[in-house]
Design a protein with these regions (language model features):
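Metallocofactor- and cofactor-centric catalytic cores in central/energy metabolism, strongly enriched
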Residues: 1-280
Protein backbone atom coordinates (compact mmCIF):
# COMPACT_ATOMS: atom_id res chain seq x y z
CA UNK A 1 0.00 0.00 0.00
CA UNK A 2 1.75 3.14 -1.19
CA UNK A 3 -0.68 5.35 0.74
CA UNK A 4 0.99 4.19 3.97
CA UNK A 5 4.13 6.08 2.87
CA UNK A 6 2.33 9.36 3.53
CA UNK A 7 2.85 11.14 6.90
CA UNK A 8 0.77 9.63 9.72
CA UNK A 9 -1.21 12.83 10.29
CA UNK A 10 -2.18 12.85 6.61
CA UNK A 11 -3.23 9.19 6.73
CA UNK A 12 -5.40 9.88 9.79
CA UNK A 13 -7.10 12.74 7.95
CA UNK A 14 -7.79 10.53 4.94
CA UNK A 15 -9.27 7.84 7.20
CA UNK A 16 -11.38 10.42 9.05
CA UNK A 17 -12.77 11.69 5.73
CA UNK A 18 -13.15 8.11 4.49
CA UNK A 19 -11.25 8.81 1.27
CA UNK A 20 -8.39 6.32 1.66
CA UNK A 21 -8.56 4.25 -1.57
CA UNK A 22 -9.53 0.61 -1.12
CA UNK A 23 -7.91 -0.51 -4.39
CA UNK A 24 -7.07 1.13 -7.71
CA UNK A 25 -9.52 -0.63 -10.01
CA UNK A 26 -12.26 -0.79 -7.39
CA UNK A 27 -12.48 3.00 -7.08
CA UNK A 28 -12.41 3.55 -10.85
CA UNK A 29 -15.05 0.87 -11.46
CA UNK A 30 -17.26 2.19 -8.66
CA UNK A 31 -17.00 5.73 -10.05
CA UNK A 32 -18.15 4.47 -13.45
CA UNK A 33 -21.07 2.69 -11.78
CA UNK A 34 -22.09 5.68 -9.65
CA UNK A 35 -22.12 8.03 -12.61
CA UNK A 36 -24.20 5.70 -14.76
CA UNK A 37 -27.83 6.44 -15.57
CA UNK A 38 -29.96 6.99 -12.45
CA UNK A 39 -27.42 5.98 -9.80
CA UNK A 40 -25.58 8.34 -7.41
CA UNK A 41 -27.35 11.70 -7.49
CA UNK A 42 -25.88 13.43 -4.41
CA UNK A 43 -23.12 15.84 -5.38
CA UNK A 44 -21.44 15.58 -1.95
CA UNK A 45 -21.31 11.79 -2.22
CA UNK A 46 -19.93 12.02 -5.77
CA UNK A 47 -17.23 14.45 -4.66
CA UNK A 48 -16.06 12.07 -1.92
CA UNK A 49 -15.89 9.20 -4.41
CA UNK A 50 -13.97 11.46 -6.80
CA UNK A 51 -11.48 12.08 -3.97
CA UNK A 52 -11.04 8.33 -3.41
CA UNK A 53 -10.54 7.81 -7.14
CA UNK A 54 -7.95 10.58 -7.40
CA UNK A 55 -6.13 9.11 -4.39
CA UNK A 56 -6.15 5.69 -6.08
CA UNK A 57 -4.63 7.32 -9.15
CA UNK A 58 -1.94 9.29 -7.34
CA UNK A 59 -1.04 7.05 -4.40
CA UNK A 60 -1.74 3.86 -6.34
CA UNK A 61 -1.33 3.85 -10.11
CA UNK A 62 1.11 6.74 -10.49
CA UNK A 63 3.43 5.61 -7.69
CA UNK A 64 3.48 2.00 -8.89
CA UNK A 65 4.20 3.17 -12.45
CA UNK A 66 7.02 5.43 -11.21
CA UNK A 67 8.66 2.61 -9.26
CA UNK A 68 8.41 0.20 -12.19
CA UNK A 69 9.83 2.73 -14.67
CA UNK A 70 12.78 3.41 -12.37
CA UNK A 71 13.42 -0.34 -12.06
CA UNK A 72 13.23 -0.93 -15.82
CA UNK A 73 14.93 2.20 -17.15
CA UNK A 74 16.91 3.60 -14.21
CA UNK A 75 16.27 6.30 -11.63
CA UNK A 76 16.81 9.79 -13.10
CA UNK A 77 19.72 11.93 -11.87
CA UNK A 78 20.33 15.67 -12.34
CA UNK A 79 20.89 16.16 -16.07
CA UNK A 80 21.39 19.14 -18.35
CA UNK A 81 19.10 19.46 -21.33
CA UNK A 82 17.38 21.88 -23.70
CA UNK A 83 13.76 22.73 -24.34
CA UNK A 84 11.48 24.50 -26.85
CA UNK A 85 11.00 24.28 -30.62
CA UNK A 86 14.55 25.44 -31.28
CA UNK A 87 15.81 21.92 -30.48
CA UNK A 88 14.56 20.74 -33.90
CA UNK A 89 17.55 20.50 -36.27
CA UNK A 90 17.46 21.95 -39.77
CA UNK A 91 20.14 19.62 -41.15
CA UNK A 92 19.24 16.34 -39.41
CA UNK A 93 16.51 13.71 -39.55
CA UNK A 94 14.05 14.86 -36.87
CA UNK A 95 11.92 12.35 -34.98
CA UNK A 96 9.38 13.43 -32.36
CA UNK A 97 8.15 10.93 -29.74
CA UNK A 98 4.88 11.72 -28.00
CA UNK A 99 2.71 9.85 -25.52
CA UNK A 100 2.99 8.10 -22.18
CA UNK A 101 4.37 4.57 -22.57
CA UNK A 102 8.15 4.54 -21.95
CA UNK A 103 8.71 1.32 -23.89
CA UNK A 104 8.23 3.03 -27.25
CA UNK A 105 10.30 6.13 -26.60
CA UNK A 106 13.16 4.24 -24.92
CA UNK A 107 13.51 1.88 -27.88
CA UNK A 108 13.31 4.70 -30.45
CA UNK A 109 16.04 6.51 -28.49
CA UNK A 110 18.31 3.47 -28.63
CA UNK A 111 17.60 2.92 -32.33
CA UNK A 112 18.23 6.58 -33.18
CA UNK A 113 21.74 6.32 -31.72
CA UNK A 114 22.62 3.17 -33.70
CA UNK A 115 25.75 3.91 -35.79
CA UNK A 116 24.35 1.87 -38.69
CA UNK A 117 21.19 3.99 -38.85
CA UNK A 118 23.17 7.20 -38.44
CA UNK A 119 25.19 6.20 -41.52
CA UNK A 120 21.94 5.61 -43.40
CA UNK A 121 20.81 9.11 -42.42
CA UNK A 122 24.08 10.59 -43.66
CA UNK A 123 23.67 8.69 -46.93
CA UNK A 124 20.46 10.62 -47.68
CA UNK A 125 22.10 13.97 -46.96
CA UNK A 126 21.40 14.48 -43.25
CA UNK A 127 24.10 15.21 -40.68
CA UNK A 128 22.56 12.79 -38.20
CA UNK A 129 19.39 11.81 -36.36
CA UNK A 130 17.82 14.23 -33.88
CA UNK A 131 15.29 12.92 -31.38
CA UNK A 132 13.01 15.19 -29.36
CA UNK A 133 9.95 14.69 -27.20
CA UNK A 134 6.53 16.20 -26.69
CA UNK A 135 4.40 16.06 -23.53
CA UNK A 136 4.89 13.41 -20.82
CA UNK A 137 7.14 11.07 -22.81
CA UNK A 138 9.38 14.07 -23.40
CA UNK A 139 9.86 14.60 -19.67
CA UNK A 140 10.89 10.97 -19.17
CA UNK A 141 13.41 11.16 -22.03
CA UNK A 142 14.80 14.45 -20.76
CA UNK A 143 15.15 13.16 -17.18
CA UNK A 144 16.87 9.91 -18.09
CA UNK A 145 18.85 10.73 -21.21
CA UNK A 146 19.00 14.51 -21.64
CA UNK A 147 17.06 14.16 -24.91
CA UNK A 148 15.61 17.59 -25.79
CA UNK A 149 12.04 18.60 -25.01
CA UNK A 150 10.43 20.11 -28.11
CA UNK A 151 7.40 21.33 -26.18
CA UNK A 152 4.39 20.62 -24.01
CA UNK A 153 1.07 19.10 -25.05
CA UNK A 154 -0.29 22.22 -26.73
CA UNK A 155 2.83 22.53 -28.91
CA UNK A 156 2.55 19.22 -30.79
CA UNK A 157 0.97 20.77 -33.89
CA UNK A 158 3.52 23.59 -33.81
CA UNK A 159 6.37 21.07 -33.84
CA UNK A 160 4.95 19.46 -36.99
CA UNK A 161 4.38 22.91 -38.52
CA UNK A 162 8.11 23.66 -38.43
CA UNK A 163 8.18 21.56 -41.61
CA UNK A 164 11.34 19.85 -40.41
CA UNK A 165 9.90 16.81 -38.63
CA UNK A 166 10.30 13.59 -40.61
CA UNK A 167 8.20 11.48 -38.24
CA UNK A 168 6.06 11.98 -35.15
CA UNK A 169 5.68 8.71 -33.26
CA UNK A 170 2.82 8.40 -30.77
CA UNK A 171 1.33 5.84 -28.41
CA UNK A 172 -1.53 6.77 -26.05
CA UNK A 173 -3.19 9.86 -24.56
CA UNK A 174 -2.77 13.59 -25.23
CA UNK A 175 -2.41 13.06 -29.00
CA UNK A 176 -4.48 15.78 -30.67
CA UNK A 177 -6.91 14.81 -33.40
CA UNK A 178 -5.58 17.57 -35.63
CA UNK A 179 -2.02 16.21 -35.72
CA UNK A 180 -2.69 13.97 -38.70
CA UNK A 181 -4.22 16.80 -40.71
CA UNK A 182 -1.29 19.11 -39.92
CA UNK A 183 1.17 16.34 -40.85
CA UNK A 184 -0.54 15.98 -44.25
CA UNK A 185 0.17 19.65 -44.96
CA UNK A 186 3.87 18.86 -44.67
CA UNK A 187 5.97 15.78 -45.41
CA UNK A 188 5.74 14.43 -41.84
CA UNK A 189 4.87 10.77 -41.32
CA UNK A 190 2.61 10.23 -38.31
CA UNK A 191 3.06 6.77 -36.82
CA UNK A 192 0.84 5.19 -34.15
CA UNK A 193 2.26 2.33 -32.08
CA UNK A 194 -0.49 1.19 -29.67
CA UNK A 195 -3.33 -1.20 -30.60
CA UNK A 196 -5.51 0.83 -28.20
CA UNK A 197 -4.99 4.13 -30.01
CA UNK A 198 -5.07 4.04 -33.80
CA UNK A 199 -5.70 7.23 -35.79
CA UNK A 200 -7.38 7.31 -39.19
CA UNK A 201 -5.01 8.35 -41.97
CA UNK A 202 -1.80 7.49 -40.13
CA UNK A 203 0.72 4.67 -40.43
CA UNK A 204 0.41 2.01 -37.72
CA UNK A 205 3.41 0.02 -36.47
CA UNK A 206 2.52 -1.88 -33.32
CA UNK A 207 5.17 -2.01 -30.61
CA UNK A 208 4.99 -4.72 -27.94
CA UNK A 209 7.31 -6.46 -25.47
CA UNK A 210 8.62 -8.95 -28.04
CA UNK A 211 9.35 -6.65 -30.98
CA UNK A 212 9.98 -3.22 -29.46
CA UNK A 213 13.55 -2.65 -30.65
CA UNK A 214 13.09 -4.11 -34.13
CA UNK A 215 9.97 -2.00 -34.71
CA UNK A 216 11.76 1.07 -33.37
CA UNK A 217 14.49 0.53 -35.98
CA UNK A 218 11.82 0.26 -38.67
CA UNK A 219 10.34 3.57 -37.51
CA UNK A 220 13.71 5.32 -37.57
CA UNK A 221 14.31 4.00 -41.11
CA UNK A 222 10.94 5.39 -42.24
CA UNK A 223 11.98 8.80 -40.91
CA UNK A 224 15.36 8.56 -42.67
CA UNK A 225 13.77 7.69 -46.01
CA UNK A 226 11.41 10.63 -45.57
CA UNK A 227 14.21 13.19 -45.12
CA UNK A 228 14.67 13.86 -48.89
CA UNK A 229 10.92 14.63 -49.10
CA UNK A 230 11.29 17.68 -46.88
CA UNK A 231 10.24 20.91 -48.61
CA UNK A 232 12.84 23.49 -47.60
CA UNK A 233 10.45 26.31 -48.53
CA UNK A 234 8.11 25.17 -45.76
CA UNK A 235 10.76 24.88 -43.06
CA UNK A 236 10.53 27.40 -40.23
CA UNK A 237 12.35 26.61 -37.00
CA UNK A 238 12.10 29.51 -34.51
CA UNK A 239 15.61 30.86 -34.02
CA UNK A 240 16.74 31.35 -30.46
CA UNK A 241 13.68 29.54 -29.10
CA UNK A 242 15.66 27.15 -26.94
CA UNK A 243 16.29 27.15 -23.19
CA UNK A 244 18.90 25.34 -21.13
CA UNK A 245 17.44 23.35 -18.24
CA UNK A 246 18.64 21.16 -15.37
CA UNK A 247 16.25 18.32 -14.52
CA UNK A 248 16.16 14.97 -12.71
CA UNK A 249 15.78 15.99 -9.07
CA UNK A 250 14.25 12.80 -7.72
CA UNK A 251 13.52 11.83 -4.12
CA UNK A 252 16.76 9.82 -4.07
CA UNK A 253 18.81 12.69 -5.48
CA UNK A 254 17.47 15.25 -3.01
CA UNK A 255 18.21 12.97 -0.04
CA UNK A 256 21.74 12.48 -1.35
CA UNK A 257 22.26 16.23 -1.80
CA UNK A 258 21.13 16.83 1.79
CA UNK A 259 23.24 14.16 3.44
CA UNK A 260 25.66 12.47 1.07
CA UNK A 261 26.07 8.77 0.41
CA UNK A 262 26.04 7.57 4.01
CA UNK A 263 23.76 10.11 5.69
CA UNK A 264 21.12 10.68 3.00
CA UNK A 265 18.17 12.24 4.80
CA UNK A 266 15.55 14.96 4.71
CA UNK A 267 16.50 15.99 8.26
CA UNK A 268 18.44 19.16 7.26
CA UNK A 269 15.45 20.34 5.22
CA UNK A 270 12.88 19.40 7.87
CA UNK A 271 14.88 21.06 10.68
CA UNK A 272 15.18 24.32 8.77
CA UNK A 273 11.49 24.36 7.88
CA UNK A 274 10.64 23.85 11.57
CA UNK A 275 13.00 26.58 12.80
CA UNK A 276 11.69 29.03 10.21
CA UNK A 277 14.84 29.47 8.10
CA UNK A 278 13.12 27.83 5.13
CA UNK A 279 9.46 28.41 4.36
CA UNK A 280 7.82 25.24 3.18
Amino acid sequence: KFATKAPETRQKLWDKLNITPRAIDREVTESMHRTGMGTDQDYKNLIMQACRTSMADGWGGAMIATELQDILFGTPKPTRGTANLGVIKEDEVNIIVHGHEPQMSEMVAIAASDPELIKEAEAVGAKGIALAGICCTANEMLLRHGIPLAGHMKMQEMAIATGAVEAIVVDIQCVMQGDEEVARAFHTKMITTSPKAKIDGTMHIEINDENAYDKARDIVRIAIKNFPERDKKKVFIPKGKKSDVVVGFTHETIKYMLGGKYRASYRPLNDNIMNGRIRG
